Amino acid sequence: LQENYITHNPVSLIRQKSRYLQKIQQARVTRKLNDRQWSILIDEIESRCAKEPLYERHLFIFSAFYLLGCRISELADTQDRQPVMSDFYQDSNHLWWFRTVGKGNKAREIAVPDAMLKSLKRYRRYIGAPGLPSPRDHCPIIPKQKGDGGIGTRQLRKIVQVGFDCAIERLAAQGQHDEAMAMRHATVHWLRHTAISKDVQHRPREHVRDDAGHQSVQVTDRYIEIDLQARHASARTKTLNTDNKETI
């Protein structure tokens, strides 16, 4: 029998391929908006609200994604659930929460910040509803402009894309073409990533985990990014002595 011999080490080839895949993954677009993109987005929508009240709905939707860290299925009507205004509720300590059902049909409550309450009041004025929701307010959170019920995921994606397009247009007009080009890849889910990435910079991880509906803190940790300059600055003062005195 004639034997065939392998001329290359297969384990070595697998390792080389693995390193190559890692480089490809690292080069992928970061799936969140940076501070500049987000600032332009909100500023542009707010400025349009003054001219066209229709953009009040856009402003509320982006506020909810950013301040609550919601998934699209937690704001839009689906076959399984229809979010209503009374999902915003006040507990016995006068704290406001947003009740929702997320991934894996898991119910949770999201802490509602003051900025979200302000946005909710503003939006309710726009749709002709008084003050903050009552426990008996079963109106859709984002009602259709025509017909009954709330908007679905398809319509919600379209509204978000309009907001993205507004920001892209403004970035391009300001000559920030790289920022505009990067934002063309944005999807609705980027808003959740943007929200959580910002949240972990200021809040305890456990709090972010529970609000985001993550199964573990390890999932939340994926959103933590360390600024390289801050990282280097914190390392510069390390010494060999426990009393931090320089010996070399």
Cite the ranges covered by each PLM segment.
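Catalytic-site neighborhood detector that most strongly recognizes the C-terminal catalytic loop/helix
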Residues: 212-237
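Active-site/catalytic core of tyrosine-dependent DNA strand-transfer enzymes
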Residues: 113-182
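N-terminal DNA-binding recognition helix of tyrosine site-specific recombinases/integrases
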Residues: 1-14, 70-73, 166-170
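Conserved tyrosine-mediated DNA breakage-rejoining catalytic core shared by Y-recombinases
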Residues: 77-122, 128
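Basic, Lys/Arg- and aromatic-enriched nucleic-acid-binding interface segment
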Residues: 39-72
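C-terminal secondary-structure termini that scaffold catalytic or DNA-interacting sites
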Residues: 237-248
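Flexible interdomain linker/hinge and immediately adjacent N-terminus
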Residues: 5-43, 145-149
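Short, basic (Lys/Arg/His-rich) helix/loop patches that form interaction surfaces
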Residues: 50, 157-210
